[in-house]
């Protein structure tokens, strides 16, 4: 979905009111600080919108810095590809203009400093979004060398960018065989990275916690049950996924619980 017919070259972000999707707040070239939590809270952000042309509700707040009317409200901050199509978006709350300066990028543009709340924009996700924008998620395994936090950020982008990247691609029909490579599964998040790519290809999403994995097995997320999952290097993965997880009145190792969830939804898990 294109954010606006007025998108220009280099504009990577678009703001739209949460209360009225016809209230478009404008484009920006950069949103520095969006992925950097402030010390006083995981979701608190101070964001520098560089090269911004504010409109609508945001424009109304620009002239009231320092007063209550500087708070524009809640919005959706979309991330745009090179053609101005929305790749994904974050809900941002209590968007407040705290500074306005002329922009060096172009006459008529301003640089806005905003305070807002956004706990879904995880640190490190900006790097993954740039890979999506540049079309660099064209082979599997790009997540292998990411830190634990980086893998979590990877999964978040895989989820938020799913609709854009799949482009209404239908689920694989029932009876398919998928192969998950267990060599790089060292913790729970790396399992989700691996199975996401096994089902949906490079940068694919197929859950990022146990409940989400179970939801994805209900169809609509890339694969139709029943299907077969060949789990390569499963012995190595089992040795890593040893965390004890509550399961009913008892608890189970994470590896065993994952297999149980898969099999309960009709997946034939072949451990190799």
Predicted regions and their residues:
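Hydrophobic, Leu/Ile/Phe/Ala-enriched alpha-helical segments that form helix-helix packing faces
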Residues: 62-66, 164, 168, 195-199, ...
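Helix-rich interaction surfaces within compact, conserved domain-sized segments
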Residues: 239-272
């Amino acid at each position: 979905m294109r954010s606006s017919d007025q998108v220009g070259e280099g504009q990577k972000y678009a703001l739209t009111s949460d209360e009225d999707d016809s209230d478009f707040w404008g484009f920006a070239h950069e949103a520095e600080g969006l992925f950097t939590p402030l010390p006083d809270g995981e979701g608190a952000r101070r964001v520098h919108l560089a090269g911004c042309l504010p409109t609508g509700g945001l424009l109304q707040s620009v002239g009231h810095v320092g007063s209550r009317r500087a708070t524009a409200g809640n919005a959706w901050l979309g991330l745009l590809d090179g053609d101005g199509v929305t790749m994904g978006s974050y809900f941002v709350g209590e968007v407040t203009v705290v500074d306005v300066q002329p922009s060096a990028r172009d006459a008529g543009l301003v640089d806005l400093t905003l305070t807002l709340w956004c706990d879904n924009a995880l640190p490190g996700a900006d790097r993954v979004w740039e890979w999506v924008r540049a079309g660099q998620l064209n082979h599997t395994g790009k997540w292998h060398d990411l830190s634990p936090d980086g893998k979590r950020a990877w999964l978040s982008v895989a989820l938020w960018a799913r609709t854009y990247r799949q482009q209404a691609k239908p689920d694989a029909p029932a009876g398919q065989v998928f192969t998950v490579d267990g060599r790089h599964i060292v913790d729970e998040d790396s399992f989700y990275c691996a199975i996401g790519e096994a089902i949906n290809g490079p940068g694919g999403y197929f859950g990022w916690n146990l409940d989400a994995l179970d939801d994805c097995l209900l169809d609509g997320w890339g694969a139709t049950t029943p299907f077969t999952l060949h789990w390569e290097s499963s012995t190595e993965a089992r040795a890593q996924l040893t965390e004890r997880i509550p399961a009913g009145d008892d608890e189970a190792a994470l590896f065993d619980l994952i297999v149980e969830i898969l099999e309960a939804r009709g997946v034939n898990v072949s451990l190799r």
